């Protein structure tokens, strides 16, 4: 059976551009990285988190003042992996603009909300879902109690992050995250998870005419 990662990489389109040294081929994601675009796609886990963090740090080193665009289509995943991305977004100097395409659920919604203020967007048919963290553990009773307390600590910390980025009260966040809460793009805007719902790319201003 073929490695699914190898199969996926074989499906990634290659693009060719002309440089002063001749033609150069890139996979499409590397080419978009040159335009300072990062993709957070699929489940949030350690390997994906490591790649996103590395790209954020690389783009900061390339230009510490120019904005980074993060396109999110994720069902969420591991809390600590998501927090690694979140902390790096807050740590680096360039502003990070976020855009939800498809879905931003669980940790995906937190990363969407964590973008720079007034630079958090969703496409019209995007779906956003927020909820409290979940987990399971087997073992000795004392260890189960310790893990349960850790989940409660994470829940409190995640609630505080949502409060910071949405402007909602802690009680409102706690109530909203008590169960899976599904939001349309417009509802996510009203809740403070995004700043604007966009359906078209903003047009570039016309160049001034020569006198």
From Swiss-Prot:
It is found in: Cytoplasm. GO terms for cellular component: cytoplasm; endopeptidase Clp complex. The active site is at residues 106, 131. InterPro entries: ClpP, ClpP/crotonase-like_dom_sf, ClpP/TepA, ClpP_His_AS. Its EC number is 3.4.21.92. GO terms for molecular function: ATP-dependent peptidase activity; ATPase binding; serine-type endopeptidase activity. It catalyses: Hydrolysis of proteins to small peptides in the presence of ATP and magnesium. alpha-casein is the usual test substrate. In the absence of ATP, only oligopeptides shorter than five residues are hydrolyzed (such as succinyl-Leu-Tyr-|-NHMec, and Leu-Tyr-Leu-|-Tyr-Trp, in which cleavage of the -Tyr-|-Leu- and -Tyr-|-Trp bonds also occurs). Its main location: cytoplasm. The keyword Methyltransferase does not apply. GO terms for biological process: protein quality control for misfolded or incompletely synthesized proteins. It comes from the Bacteria. Keywords: Cytoplasm, Hydrolase, Protease, Serine protease. Pfam families: CLP_protease. Cleaves peptides in various proteins in a process that requires ATP hydrolysis. Has a chymotrypsin-like activity. Plays a major role in the degradation of misfolded proteins. NCBIfam families: PRK00277.1, PRK12553.1. Belongs to the peptidase S14 family. Fourteen ClpP subunits assemble into 2 heptameric rings which stack back to back to give a disk-like structure with a central cavity, resembling the structure of eukaryotic proteasomes. This is ATP-dependent Clp protease proteolytic subunit. It comes from Nitrobacter hamburgensis (strain DSM 10229 / NCIMB 13809 / X14). The lineage of its organism: Bacteria, Pseudomonadati, Pseudomonadota, Alphaproteobacteria, Hyphomicrobiales.
């Amino acid at each position: 059976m073929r490695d699914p990662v190898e199969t996926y990489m074989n499906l990634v389109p290659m693009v060719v551009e002309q440089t002063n040294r001749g033609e150069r081929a890139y996979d499409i994601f590397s080419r978009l990285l040159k335009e300072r675009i990062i993709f957070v796609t699929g489940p949030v886990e350690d390997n994906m988190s490591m790649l996103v963090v590395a790209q954020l740090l690389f783009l900061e080193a390339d230009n510490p003042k120019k904005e980074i665009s993060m396109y999110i289509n994720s069902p969420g995943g591991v809390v600590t992996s998501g927090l690694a991305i979140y902390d790096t977004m807050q740590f680096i100097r360039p502003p990070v603009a976020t855009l939800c395409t498809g879905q931003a659920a669980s940790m995906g919604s937190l990363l969407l909300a964590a973008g720079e203020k007034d630079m958090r967007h969703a496409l019209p048919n995007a779906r956003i879902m927020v909820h409290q963290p979940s987990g399971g553990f087997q073992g000795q009773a004392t260890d189960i109690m310790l893990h349960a307390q850790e989940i409660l600590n994470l829940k409190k910390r995640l609630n505080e992050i949502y409060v910071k980025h949405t402007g909602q009260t802690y009680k409102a966040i706690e109530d909203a995250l008590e169960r899976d809460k599904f939001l349309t793009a417009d509802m996510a805007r009203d809740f403070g998870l995004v700043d604007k719902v966009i359906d078209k790319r903003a047009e570039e201003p016309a160049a001034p005419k020569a006198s």
